[in-house]
From Swiss-Prot:
<dbReference type="InterPro" id="IPR036621">
    <property type="entry name" value="Anticodon-bd_dom_sf"/>
</dbReference>
<dbReference type="InterPro" id="IPR004154">
    <property type="entry name" value="Anticodon-bd"/>
</dbReference>
<comment type="function">
    <text>Catalyzes the attachment of proline to tRNA(Pro) in a two-step reaction: proline is first activated by ATP to form Pro-AMP and then transferred to the acceptor end of tRNA(Pro).</text>
</comment>
<dbReference type="GO" id="GO:0005737">
    <property type="term" value="C:cytoplasm"/>
</dbReference>
<dbReference type="InterPro" id="IPR033721">
    <property type="entry name" value="ProRS_core_arch_euk"/>
</dbReference>
<dbReference type="InterPro" id="IPR004499">
    <property type="entry name" value="Pro-tRNA-ligase_IIa_arc-type"/>
</dbReference>
<keyword id="KW-0067">ATP-binding</keyword>
<dbReference type="GO" id="GO:0004827">
    <property type="term" value="F:proline-tRNA ligase activity"/>
</dbReference>
<dbReference type="InterPro" id="IPR017449">
    <property type="entry name" value="Pro-tRNA_synth_II"/>
</dbReference>
<keyword id="KW-0648">Protein biosynthesis</keyword>
<comment type="similarity">
    <text>Belongs to the class-II aminoacyl-tRNA synthetase family. ProS type 3 subfamily.</text>
</comment>
<keyword id="KW-0436">Ligase</keyword>
<dbReference type="InterPro" id="IPR006195">
    <property type="entry name" value="aa-tRNA-synth_II"/>
</dbReference>
<comment type="subunit">
    <text>Homodimer.</text>
</comment>
<dbReference type="InterPro" id="IPR002316">
    <property type="entry name" value="Pro-tRNA-ligase_IIa"/>
</dbReference>
<dbReference type="GO" id="GO:0005524">
    <property type="term" value="F:ATP binding"/>
</dbReference>
<protein>
    <recommendedName>
        <fullName>Proline--tRNA ligase</fullName>
        <ecNumber>6.1.1.15</ecNumber>
    </recommendedName>
</protein>
Length: 479
Protein backbone atom coordinates (compact mmCIF):
# COMPACT_ATOMS: atom_id res chain seq x y z
CA UNK A 1 0.00 0.00 0.00
CA UNK A 2 1.37 3.39 -1.03
CA UNK A 3 2.34 5.75 1.78
CA UNK A 4 0.26 8.96 1.82
CA UNK A 5 2.21 11.84 0.29
CA UNK A 6 2.86 15.07 2.13
CA UNK A 7 0.02 17.56 1.77
CA UNK A 8 0.91 21.12 0.82
CA UNK A 9 0.12 23.52 3.67
CA UNK A 10 -2.79 25.94 3.35
CA UNK A 11 -0.56 28.95 3.97
CA UNK A 12 1.98 27.90 1.33
CA UNK A 13 -0.53 27.34 -1.47
CA UNK A 14 -4.23 27.03 -0.69
CA UNK A 15 -5.23 25.87 -4.17
CA UNK A 16 -2.56 23.15 -4.17
CA UNK A 17 -3.55 22.15 -0.62
CA UNK A 18 -7.15 21.67 -1.73
CA UNK A 19 -6.20 19.44 -4.66
CA UNK A 20 -3.76 17.47 -2.48
CA UNK A 21 -6.48 16.79 0.09
CA UNK A 22 -9.23 15.69 -2.29
CA UNK A 23 -6.89 13.42 -4.27
CA UNK A 24 -4.92 11.90 -1.38
CA UNK A 25 -8.12 11.37 0.61
CA UNK A 26 -9.54 9.38 -2.32
CA UNK A 27 -12.51 11.61 -3.06
CA UNK A 28 -11.84 11.81 -6.79
CA UNK A 29 -9.53 11.33 -9.75
CA UNK A 30 -9.36 13.64 -12.74
CA UNK A 31 -11.49 12.54 -15.70
CA UNK A 32 -10.30 12.24 -19.31
CA UNK A 33 -11.93 15.53 -20.39
CA UNK A 34 -11.28 18.94 -18.87
CA UNK A 35 -13.55 19.65 -15.92
CA UNK A 36 -14.69 16.06 -15.42
CA UNK A 37 -13.86 13.85 -12.46
CA UNK A 38 -14.18 10.24 -11.40
CA UNK A 39 -16.09 10.15 -8.12
CA UNK A 40 -14.35 7.59 -5.94
CA UNK A 41 -16.43 5.62 -3.39
CA UNK A 42 -15.65 7.95 -0.46
CA UNK A 43 -16.47 11.07 -2.50
CA UNK A 44 -19.70 9.62 -3.81
CA UNK A 45 -20.74 8.48 -0.32
CA UNK A 46 -20.71 12.13 0.79
CA UNK A 47 -23.12 12.94 -2.03
CA UNK A 48 -25.31 9.96 -1.09
CA UNK A 49 -25.52 11.29 2.48
CA UNK A 50 -26.47 14.74 1.18
CA UNK A 51 -29.15 13.21 -1.07
CA UNK A 52 -30.60 11.18 1.80
CA UNK A 53 -30.95 14.18 4.13
CA UNK A 54 -32.22 16.66 1.54
CA UNK A 55 -34.62 14.17 -0.03
CA UNK A 56 -36.20 13.47 3.37
CA UNK A 57 -37.06 17.18 3.62
CA UNK A 58 -38.52 17.18 0.11
CA UNK A 59 -40.77 14.24 1.01
CA UNK A 60 -42.10 16.20 4.01
CA UNK A 61 -42.84 19.14 1.71
CA UNK A 62 -44.70 16.83 -0.71
CA UNK A 63 -42.11 17.47 -3.42
CA UNK A 64 -42.03 14.51 -5.81
CA UNK A 65 -38.96 13.24 -7.68
CA UNK A 66 -38.89 12.96 -11.46
CA UNK A 67 -36.26 12.59 -14.15
CA UNK A 68 -36.28 14.65 -17.36
CA UNK A 69 -34.33 14.43 -20.64
CA UNK A 70 -30.69 15.48 -20.93
CA UNK A 71 -31.27 16.96 -24.40
CA UNK A 72 -33.07 20.21 -25.26
CA UNK A 73 -34.42 20.99 -28.77
CA UNK A 74 -33.52 24.17 -30.62
CA UNK A 75 -37.04 25.63 -30.60
CA UNK A 76 -37.00 25.60 -26.76
CA UNK A 77 -33.76 27.57 -26.82
CA UNK A 78 -35.24 30.15 -29.19
CA UNK A 79 -38.25 30.63 -26.88
CA UNK A 80 -36.02 31.62 -23.98
CA UNK A 81 -33.13 33.55 -25.51
CA UNK A 82 -32.78 35.82 -22.48
CA UNK A 83 -32.47 32.84 -20.13
CA UNK A 84 -30.00 31.05 -22.39
CA UNK A 85 -27.84 34.17 -22.83
CA UNK A 86 -26.60 33.60 -19.29
CA UNK A 87 -25.40 30.12 -20.25
CA UNK A 88 -24.36 30.81 -23.86
CA UNK A 89 -20.58 30.51 -23.32
CA UNK A 90 -21.08 27.21 -21.45
CA UNK A 91 -23.79 25.63 -23.61
CA UNK A 92 -22.77 22.32 -25.20
CA UNK A 93 -24.28 21.88 -28.65
CA UNK A 94 -24.73 18.72 -30.73
CA UNK A 95 -24.53 19.52 -34.44
CA UNK A 96 -23.59 16.16 -35.92
CA UNK A 97 -24.48 12.50 -35.32
CA UNK A 98 -22.47 9.70 -36.95
CA UNK A 99 -20.88 12.10 -39.41
CA UNK A 100 -24.24 13.51 -40.52
CA UNK A 101 -25.13 17.13 -39.80
CA UNK A 102 -28.37 17.64 -37.88
CA UNK A 103 -31.11 19.77 -39.42
CA UNK A 104 -31.52 21.50 -36.05
CA UNK A 105 -29.01 21.67 -33.23
CA UNK A 106 -29.62 19.76 -30.02
CA UNK A 107 -28.40 21.17 -26.70
CA UNK A 108 -27.22 19.42 -23.55
CA UNK A 109 -29.01 20.84 -20.52
CA UNK A 110 -27.10 23.38 -18.42
CA UNK A 111 -30.28 23.53 -16.30
CA UNK A 112 -33.86 22.40 -16.89
CA UNK A 113 -36.21 25.39 -16.64
CA UNK A 114 -37.18 24.97 -20.30
CA UNK A 115 -38.01 21.29 -19.90
CA UNK A 116 -40.04 21.84 -16.73
CA UNK A 117 -41.99 24.66 -18.39
CA UNK A 118 -42.90 22.32 -21.24
CA UNK A 119 -43.91 19.58 -18.78
CA UNK A 120 -45.98 21.94 -16.63
CA UNK A 121 -47.86 23.19 -19.69
CA UNK A 122 -48.99 19.66 -20.58
CA UNK A 123 -49.86 18.67 -17.00
CA UNK A 124 -51.90 21.79 -16.27
CA UNK A 125 -53.77 21.49 -19.57
CA UNK A 126 -54.65 17.93 -18.57
CA UNK A 127 -55.47 18.34 -14.86
CA UNK A 128 -55.61 22.09 -14.03
CA UNK A 129 -54.29 21.37 -10.52
CA UNK A 130 -51.83 23.74 -8.80
CA UNK A 131 -49.35 23.85 -7.22
CA UNK A 132 -47.09 21.22 -8.78
CA UNK A 133 -43.88 20.61 -6.82
CA UNK A 134 -41.16 18.49 -8.43
CA UNK A 135 -37.46 17.76 -8.06
CA UNK A 136 -34.90 15.83 -10.04
CA UNK A 137 -31.55 14.42 -8.99
CA UNK A 138 -29.46 14.57 -12.13
CA UNK A 139 -26.31 15.76 -13.82
CA UNK A 140 -25.87 18.85 -15.98
CA UNK A 141 -23.07 19.96 -18.28
CA UNK A 142 -21.58 23.42 -18.64
CA UNK A 143 -18.38 24.07 -20.57
CA UNK A 144 -16.63 26.03 -17.82
CA UNK A 145 -13.68 28.20 -18.83
CA UNK A 146 -11.91 27.66 -15.51
CA UNK A 147 -12.51 24.39 -13.68
CA UNK A 148 -11.86 23.24 -10.12
CA UNK A 149 -12.83 19.76 -8.84
CA UNK A 150 -16.25 19.77 -7.12
CA UNK A 151 -16.37 23.58 -7.05
CA UNK A 152 -16.67 24.14 -10.80
CA UNK A 153 -16.93 21.09 -13.02
CA UNK A 154 -17.92 20.70 -16.66
CA UNK A 155 -20.25 17.91 -15.54
CA UNK A 156 -21.68 17.86 -12.03
CA UNK A 157 -24.41 16.26 -9.97
CA UNK A 158 -27.17 18.29 -8.38
CA UNK A 159 -30.78 18.50 -7.41
CA UNK A 160 -32.97 20.99 -9.19
CA UNK A 161 -36.43 21.62 -7.88
CA UNK A 162 -39.20 23.29 -9.86
CA UNK A 163 -42.66 24.38 -8.76
CA UNK A 164 -45.57 26.17 -10.37
CA UNK A 165 -48.23 28.11 -8.44
CA UNK A 166 -51.44 30.04 -9.01
CA UNK A 167 -50.30 32.91 -6.78
CA UNK A 168 -47.30 35.21 -7.12
CA UNK A 169 -46.99 35.50 -3.35
CA UNK A 170 -47.21 31.74 -2.84
CA UNK A 171 -44.46 31.11 -5.41
CA UNK A 172 -42.11 33.75 -4.01
CA UNK A 173 -42.69 32.54 -0.45
CA UNK A 174 -41.95 28.97 -1.51
CA UNK A 175 -38.62 30.01 -3.04
CA UNK A 176 -37.74 31.79 0.22
CA UNK A 177 -38.77 28.71 2.21
CA UNK A 178 -36.39 26.52 0.21
CA UNK A 179 -33.58 29.05 0.69
CA UNK A 180 -34.19 28.90 4.46
CA UNK A 181 -33.96 25.11 4.30
CA UNK A 182 -30.64 25.31 2.44
CA UNK A 183 -29.30 27.58 5.18
CA UNK A 184 -30.53 25.15 7.84
CA UNK A 185 -29.01 22.17 6.02
CA UNK A 186 -25.58 23.76 5.60
CA UNK A 187 -25.43 24.99 9.17
CA UNK A 188 -26.91 21.98 10.97
CA UNK A 189 -25.52 19.11 8.89
CA UNK A 190 -22.41 20.44 7.15
CA UNK A 191 -21.45 22.73 10.07
CA UNK A 192 -20.96 25.57 7.58
CA UNK A 193 -22.27 29.00 8.69
CA UNK A 194 -23.74 30.99 5.83
CA UNK A 195 -24.87 34.50 5.01
CA UNK A 196 -28.22 34.46 3.25
CA UNK A 197 -29.82 37.16 1.17
CA UNK A 198 -31.10 38.22 -2.22
CA UNK A 199 -28.90 38.52 -5.30
CA UNK A 200 -28.47 41.91 -6.96
CA UNK A 201 -29.94 42.54 -10.40
CA UNK A 202 -26.54 41.87 -11.99
CA UNK A 203 -25.91 38.62 -10.12
CA UNK A 204 -29.36 37.04 -10.13
CA UNK A 205 -30.15 33.93 -12.19
CA UNK A 206 -30.91 34.62 -15.85
CA UNK A 207 -34.69 34.51 -16.23
CA UNK A 208 -35.44 35.03 -12.53
CA UNK A 209 -37.33 37.88 -10.89
CA UNK A 210 -35.54 37.26 -7.58
CA UNK A 211 -32.69 34.94 -6.61
CA UNK A 212 -32.14 33.97 -2.96
CA UNK A 213 -28.70 32.66 -2.04
CA UNK A 214 -26.65 31.22 0.80
CA UNK A 215 -22.98 32.25 0.80
CA UNK A 216 -20.21 30.54 2.77
CA UNK A 217 -16.68 31.65 3.67
CA UNK A 218 -13.84 29.27 2.84
CA UNK A 219 -10.62 29.16 4.89
CA UNK A 220 -8.89 31.41 2.35
CA UNK A 221 -11.70 33.95 2.91
CA UNK A 222 -13.24 33.50 -0.53
CA UNK A 223 -17.01 33.21 -0.85
CA UNK A 224 -18.74 30.15 -2.23
CA UNK A 225 -22.32 30.38 -3.48
CA UNK A 226 -23.55 27.19 -1.85
CA UNK A 227 -27.19 26.97 -2.94
CA UNK A 228 -29.79 29.18 -4.59
CA UNK A 229 -33.56 29.46 -4.95
CA UNK A 230 -35.21 31.50 -7.69
CA UNK A 231 -38.61 33.13 -7.99
CA UNK A 232 -39.13 33.00 -11.76
CA UNK A 233 -42.36 34.97 -11.86
CA UNK A 234 -44.25 34.41 -15.13
CA UNK A 235 -41.17 34.66 -17.36
CA UNK A 236 -41.12 31.05 -18.53
CA UNK A 237 -44.89 30.58 -18.32
CA UNK A 238 -45.47 33.44 -20.77
CA UNK A 239 -42.93 32.20 -23.29
CA UNK A 240 -44.29 28.65 -23.13
CA UNK A 241 -47.91 29.86 -23.05
CA UNK A 242 -48.80 28.06 -19.83
CA UNK A 243 -52.34 28.77 -18.60
CA UNK A 244 -54.56 27.47 -15.83
CA UNK A 245 -58.26 28.10 -15.14
CA UNK A 246 -59.01 29.96 -11.91
CA UNK A 247 -62.16 29.59 -9.78
CA UNK A 248 -64.06 31.86 -12.17
CA UNK A 249 -62.93 29.57 -15.03
CA UNK A 250 -60.78 32.35 -16.49
CA UNK A 251 -57.38 31.58 -18.01
CA UNK A 252 -54.49 32.85 -15.89
CA UNK A 253 -50.70 32.67 -16.23
CA UNK A 254 -49.10 30.85 -13.25
CA UNK A 255 -45.85 31.59 -11.39
CA UNK A 256 -42.77 29.38 -11.13
CA UNK A 257 -39.76 28.72 -8.91
CA UNK A 258 -36.54 26.76 -9.33
CA UNK A 259 -33.88 25.91 -6.77
CA UNK A 260 -30.83 23.72 -6.37
CA UNK A 261 -27.68 22.59 -4.65
CA UNK A 262 -24.87 20.52 -6.10
CA UNK A 263 -21.72 18.50 -5.53
CA UNK A 264 -19.85 21.77 -5.00
CA UNK A 265 -20.93 21.27 -1.36
CA UNK A 266 -18.30 18.51 -1.17
CA UNK A 267 -15.69 21.13 -2.01
CA UNK A 268 -17.21 23.44 0.60
CA UNK A 269 -16.90 20.80 3.33
CA UNK A 270 -13.23 20.33 2.46
CA UNK A 271 -12.41 24.04 2.23
CA UNK A 272 -14.23 25.05 5.41
CA UNK A 273 -13.14 22.29 7.81
CA UNK A 274 -10.04 20.39 6.66
CA UNK A 275 -6.44 20.99 7.76
CA UNK A 276 -2.87 20.34 6.64
CA UNK A 277 -3.17 16.67 7.62
CA UNK A 278 -6.16 16.01 5.36
CA UNK A 279 -9.94 15.87 5.55
CA UNK A 280 -12.05 16.70 8.57
CA UNK A 281 -15.67 15.61 8.24
CA UNK A 282 -18.56 16.97 10.31
CA UNK A 283 -20.01 13.83 11.95
CA UNK A 284 -23.54 14.31 10.56
CA UNK A 285 -22.32 14.05 6.95
CA UNK A 286 -19.24 11.84 7.43
CA UNK A 287 -19.20 8.65 5.32
CA UNK A 288 -17.31 6.97 8.16
CA UNK A 289 -17.73 8.40 11.67
CA UNK A 290 -15.25 6.14 13.47
CA UNK A 291 -12.00 4.56 12.29
CA UNK A 292 -11.06 1.50 14.34
CA UNK A 293 -7.30 0.95 14.08
CA UNK A 294 -5.91 -2.45 15.08
CA UNK A 295 -2.29 -2.47 16.29
CA UNK A 296 -0.29 -5.76 16.41
CA UNK A 297 -3.44 -7.75 15.57
CA UNK A 298 -1.53 -10.25 13.41
CA UNK A 299 0.39 -11.41 16.46
CA UNK A 300 -2.43 -10.93 18.94
CA UNK A 301 -5.84 -12.30 17.95
CA UNK A 302 -7.38 -10.76 21.08
CA UNK A 303 -6.94 -7.35 19.43
CA UNK A 304 -9.12 -8.51 16.52
CA UNK A 305 -11.75 -9.89 18.89
CA UNK A 306 -11.76 -6.58 20.82
CA UNK A 307 -12.12 -4.61 17.57
CA UNK A 308 -15.14 -6.69 16.58
CA UNK A 309 -16.67 -6.08 20.00
CA UNK A 310 -16.24 -2.33 19.50
CA UNK A 311 -17.70 -2.58 15.99
CA UNK A 312 -20.79 -4.37 17.31
CA UNK A 313 -21.41 -1.63 19.89
CA UNK A 314 -21.06 1.09 17.23
CA UNK A 315 -23.33 -0.76 14.82
CA UNK A 316 -26.05 -1.08 17.46
CA UNK A 317 -25.66 2.64 18.18
CA UNK A 318 -26.06 3.37 14.43
CA UNK A 319 -22.62 4.94 14.28
CA UNK A 320 -20.79 4.23 11.01
CA UNK A 321 -17.32 2.71 11.30
CA UNK A 322 -14.48 1.05 9.44
CA UNK A 323 -11.86 -1.37 10.78
CA UNK A 324 -8.25 -1.04 9.61
CA UNK A 325 -6.94 -4.57 10.15
CA UNK A 326 -4.06 -4.29 7.68
CA UNK A 327 -0.50 -5.10 8.72
CA UNK A 328 0.72 -1.56 8.05
CA UNK A 329 2.84 0.23 10.65
CA UNK A 330 1.14 2.24 13.41
CA UNK A 331 2.31 5.59 12.03
CA UNK A 332 0.95 4.78 8.59
CA UNK A 333 -2.46 3.77 9.94
CA UNK A 334 -2.79 6.94 12.01
CA UNK A 335 -1.68 9.12 9.09
CA UNK A 336 -4.05 7.35 6.72
CA UNK A 337 -6.95 7.88 9.12
CA UNK A 338 -6.07 11.58 9.45
CA UNK A 339 -6.00 12.05 5.67
CA UNK A 340 -9.41 10.42 5.18
CA UNK A 341 -11.10 12.55 7.83
CA UNK A 342 -13.20 10.26 10.05
CA UNK A 343 -14.25 12.45 13.03
CA UNK A 344 -13.05 9.84 15.55
CA UNK A 345 -10.45 7.12 15.55
CA UNK A 346 -10.17 4.36 18.12
CA UNK A 347 -6.71 2.87 18.62
CA UNK A 348 -6.57 -0.74 19.83
CA UNK A 349 -3.46 -2.57 20.93
CA UNK A 350 -2.64 -5.25 23.51
CA UNK A 351 -2.77 -2.69 26.35
CA UNK A 352 -6.32 -1.64 25.48
CA UNK A 353 -7.39 -5.29 25.37
CA UNK A 354 -5.70 -6.03 28.68
CA UNK A 355 -7.39 -3.08 30.44
CA UNK A 356 -10.74 -3.41 28.62
CA UNK A 357 -10.13 0.21 27.66
CA UNK A 358 -10.87 2.50 24.73
CA UNK A 359 -8.32 4.98 23.39
CA UNK A 360 -10.34 7.51 21.39
CA UNK A 361 -8.84 10.43 19.42
CA UNK A 362 -10.74 13.39 17.96
CA UNK A 363 -9.71 14.15 14.38
CA UNK A 364 -10.35 17.90 14.61
CA UNK A 365 -8.19 18.75 17.66
CA UNK A 366 -6.36 15.44 18.39
CA UNK A 367 -7.70 15.33 21.94
CA UNK A 368 -7.39 11.84 23.47
CA UNK A 369 -9.88 10.09 25.73
CA UNK A 370 -9.41 6.89 27.74
CA UNK A 371 -12.39 5.06 29.22
CA UNK A 372 -13.88 1.61 29.80
CA UNK A 373 -15.48 -0.06 26.79
CA UNK A 374 -18.83 -0.13 28.63
CA UNK A 375 -18.98 3.66 28.16
CA UNK A 376 -18.28 3.54 24.42
CA UNK A 377 -21.80 4.17 23.10
CA UNK A 378 -22.47 7.09 25.45
CA UNK A 379 -19.02 8.68 25.05
CA UNK A 380 -18.91 8.26 21.29
CA UNK A 381 -22.29 9.91 20.75
CA UNK A 382 -21.41 12.79 23.04
CA UNK A 383 -18.03 13.40 21.41
CA UNK A 384 -19.50 13.28 17.90
CA UNK A 385 -22.07 15.89 18.94
CA UNK A 386 -19.31 18.05 20.39
CA UNK A 387 -17.19 17.80 17.24
CA UNK A 388 -20.18 18.87 15.12
CA UNK A 389 -20.79 21.87 17.37
CA UNK A 390 -17.10 22.82 17.58
CA UNK A 391 -16.59 22.72 13.81
CA UNK A 392 -19.56 25.03 13.30
CA UNK A 393 -18.39 27.38 16.07
CA UNK A 394 -14.87 27.58 14.63
CA UNK A 395 -16.20 28.37 11.15
CA UNK A 396 -18.69 30.92 12.55
CA UNK A 397 -15.93 32.74 14.43
CA UNK A 398 -13.86 32.85 11.22
CA UNK A 399 -16.82 34.32 9.34
CA UNK A 400 -17.59 36.97 11.94
CA UNK A 401 -13.97 37.98 12.52
CA UNK A 402 -13.35 38.44 8.81
CA UNK A 403 -16.50 40.31 7.83
CA UNK A 404 -16.22 44.10 8.05
CA UNK A 405 -18.54 47.06 7.55
CA UNK A 406 -17.29 49.98 5.42
CA UNK A 407 -18.59 53.47 4.65
CA UNK A 408 -16.37 54.58 1.78
CA UNK A 409 -14.87 53.24 -1.42
CA UNK A 410 -11.36 53.61 0.03
CA UNK A 411 -12.29 51.48 3.06
CA UNK A 412 -13.94 49.03 0.69
CA UNK A 413 -10.87 48.60 -1.51
CA UNK A 414 -8.56 48.16 1.48
CA UNK A 415 -10.84 45.56 3.09
CA UNK A 416 -11.06 43.52 -0.13
CA UNK A 417 -7.27 43.78 -0.46
CA UNK A 418 -7.08 42.28 3.05
CA UNK A 419 -9.30 39.35 1.92
CA UNK A 420 -12.33 40.35 4.00
CA UNK A 421 -16.02 39.86 3.42
CA UNK A 422 -17.25 43.44 3.08
CA UNK A 423 -20.68 44.85 3.91
CA UNK A 424 -21.33 48.24 2.35
CA UNK A 425 -24.29 50.58 1.88
CA UNK A 426 -24.83 50.23 -1.85
CA UNK A 427 -27.60 51.29 -4.21
CA UNK A 428 -25.66 51.58 -7.43
CA UNK A 429 -26.15 50.28 -10.96
CA UNK A 430 -24.95 46.94 -12.35
CA UNK A 431 -22.28 48.96 -14.17
CA UNK A 432 -20.88 50.06 -10.80
CA UNK A 433 -20.77 46.42 -9.68
CA UNK A 434 -18.82 45.56 -12.81
CA UNK A 435 -16.43 48.44 -12.12
CA UNK A 436 -15.87 47.11 -8.59
CA UNK A 437 -15.20 43.63 -9.91
CA UNK A 438 -12.73 44.85 -12.51
CA UNK A 439 -10.89 47.00 -9.97
CA UNK A 440 -10.88 44.71 -6.91
CA UNK A 441 -11.88 41.23 -8.06
CA UNK A 442 -14.86 41.27 -5.66
CA UNK A 443 -18.48 40.62 -6.62
CA UNK A 444 -21.77 41.38 -4.92
CA UNK A 445 -22.71 38.18 -3.11
CA UNK A 446 -26.12 39.25 -1.79
CA UNK A 447 -28.29 42.04 -0.45
CA UNK A 448 -28.57 41.46 3.29
CA UNK A 449 -32.05 41.15 4.83
CA UNK A 450 -33.07 43.41 7.69
CA UNK A 451 -33.06 40.46 10.09
CA UNK A 452 -29.45 39.54 9.28
CA UNK A 453 -27.34 38.46 12.28
CA UNK A 454 -25.10 41.44 11.48
CA UNK A 455 -26.12 44.58 13.36
CA UNK A 456 -26.95 46.83 10.41
CA UNK A 457 -27.91 50.50 10.71
CA UNK A 458 -31.29 51.60 9.34
CA UNK A 459 -29.65 53.59 6.54
CA UNK A 460 -26.24 54.52 5.19
CA UNK A 461 -24.65 56.56 2.42
CA UNK A 462 -23.97 54.53 -0.71
CA UNK A 463 -20.19 54.16 -1.08
CA UNK A 464 -20.07 55.57 -4.62
CA UNK A 465 -22.77 58.22 -4.91
CA UNK A 466 -23.16 59.12 -1.24
CA UNK A 467 -26.94 58.89 -1.60
CA UNK A 468 -28.87 57.67 1.43
CA UNK A 469 -29.89 54.02 1.13
CA UNK A 470 -31.35 51.25 3.27
CA UNK A 471 -29.71 48.59 1.10
CA UNK A 472 -26.59 46.84 2.44
CA UNK A 473 -24.71 44.48 0.15
CA UNK A 474 -22.14 41.79 0.91
CA UNK A 475 -19.09 41.80 -1.38
CA UNK A 476 -16.24 39.30 -1.55
CA UNK A 477 -13.84 37.55 -3.85
CA UNK A 478 -15.39 34.24 -4.75
CA UNK A 479 -15.16 30.88 -6.47
Amino acid sequence: MKKPEKITSRTANFAKWYVDVITQADLMNYGPIKGTIYFKPLGYKIWENIVKIVNAYFVKQKIENVYFPLLIPQDFIEKEKKHIEGFAPELLTITKVGGKNLVENIYIRPTSELLFADYFKAEIAKNNILPIKLNQWSQVLRWEKTTNPFLRNTEFLWQEGHTIHASKVEADQFAKKIARFYKYFLENYLAIPVISGQKTEREKFAGAVNTYTVEAMMQNFRALQSATAHFLGQNFAKNFEIFYKNKENKSQIPFQTSWGLSTRLIGAIVMVHSDDNGLIFPPKIAPIQVDILEFFSKKNQEVKIFAKKIAKILKNAKISYKIDDTDQQIGYKINNSEVHGAPIRIEIGPNEVKNNQICLVRRDNHQKFFFNIDLLKEKCRKILEQIQADLFKKAKIRLLENTVFVNSINEFEQAIKNNKFVIAPFSESPEREQEIQEKTGATARCILPKNSFFALPQTGNSIFSGEKTNKFVLFAKSY
